[in-house]
Amino acid sequence: MTTFFQQHFSRNKWLAYAQLMRFDKPIGTLLLLHPTLWALFAAAGGMPPLSVLVIFVLGVIVMRAAGCVINDYADRHIDGEVKRTSQRPLATGRVTTTEAKILFVLLLCIAFVLDLLLNRYTFLLSFVAVALAIIYPFMKRFTHLPQVVLGMAFGWAIPMAYGAVSESLPLECWLLFFANIFWTVAYDTQYAMVDRDDDLRIGVKSTAILFAQYDNKIIALLQFITLVLLVIFGWISQYHWGYFVVLGLSASLFSHQCWLTKQRVREQCFKAFLNNHYFGLGVFFAILVGIYA
């Protein structure tokens, strides 16, 4: 029994579990949290019920962790071939495939309990979220557009938030949802640009490979479409003009990102990806200004 606990629950093992769930790299959680907060506050016309807010924040943390576990499980045979991912717990053997599968199921169970605390409408929508989380990691084997599926997975919290607050999915919900998809494809292409050389070598597909030398131009187009959808969203929602001012200021970050990725240097592309956290935060502030100003 002692050996069992030492093998599966030692301090080093807990650290490996935490790394597998990316607790040491919160950027993914933030990029999932921002659109969730957009939708919660937009649907409520202000502060959503505290219980709903807490459930969704916890749900973001849990589902982001689950997504990382299933992603690394799917990529366990190729992560070791990529410079950026070669030290991940499954790639190095610090976490076994059995441990990863058990952890994934436990995280889904926690998410299931959280969903039970919401209304039936939202509970039913949550099954789509789980399906997208499971499907996404395997898409890079079959299509150059896995980022689109990631955008759907990261954005599905938006209809869930509207469902939890209003039990309806109005036009505003879908404008935010599709804005988030275009934004996600843009920033995850920046992320994929970091690994492009490795991905080409091992045969992994991505939008960074698909877009090739047109990558920066297409990213700029995707960002422009994101902004157009967010402007339409604000107009339909009849937000205060301050929303559009803050949104415009946030949009200036896209210009900075284009400058960073211009030379396609790995480190600069990764900085551009990280910078999207501030854009997501800016949109959230814009919504608050639009509602309360």
Swiss-Prot record:
Q: What class of enzyme is it?
A: transferase
Q: How does it sit in the membrane?
A: Multi-pass membrane protein
Required co-factor(s) are:
Mg(2+)
GO MF, one term, reads:
4-hydroxybenzoate polyprenyltransferase activity
Which regions span the lipid bilayer? 41-61, 98-118, 122-142, 145-165, 167-187, 218-238, 241-261, 272-292
Q: Answer yes or no on keyword NADP.
A: no
- Localization (cell): Cell inner membrane
The pathway this protein participates in, as annotated, is: Cofactor biosynthesis; ubiquinone biosynthesis
Report the EC code(s) recorded for this entry.
2.5.1.39
Q: What is its main location?
A: membrane
GO BP terms? ubiquinone biosynthetic process
Q: Which domain of life is it from?
A: Bacteria
Give the keywords, sorted: Cell inner membrane, Cell membrane, Magnesium, Membrane, Transferase, Transmembrane, Transmembrane helix, Ubiquinone biosynthesis
CDD domains, from UniProt? Answer: PT_UbiA_COQ2
> Which InterPro entries does the entry mention?
HB_polyprenyltransferase-like, Prenyltransferase, UbiA_prenyltransferase, UbiA_prenylTrfase_CS, UbiA_sf
Identify one Gene Ontology CC term for this UniProt entry.
plasma membrane
| The protein's role, per its UniProt record | Catalyzes the prenylation of para-hydroxybenzoate (PHB) with an all-trans polyprenyl group. Mediates the second step in the final reaction sequence of ubiquinone-8 (UQ-8) biosynthesis, which is the condensation of the polyisoprenoid side chain with PHB, generating the first membrane-bound Q intermediate 3-octaprenyl-4-hydroxybenzoate.
Q: Which family does it belong to?
A: Belongs to the UbiA prenyltransferase family.
This chain belongs to the protein called 4-hydroxybenzoate octaprenyltransferase
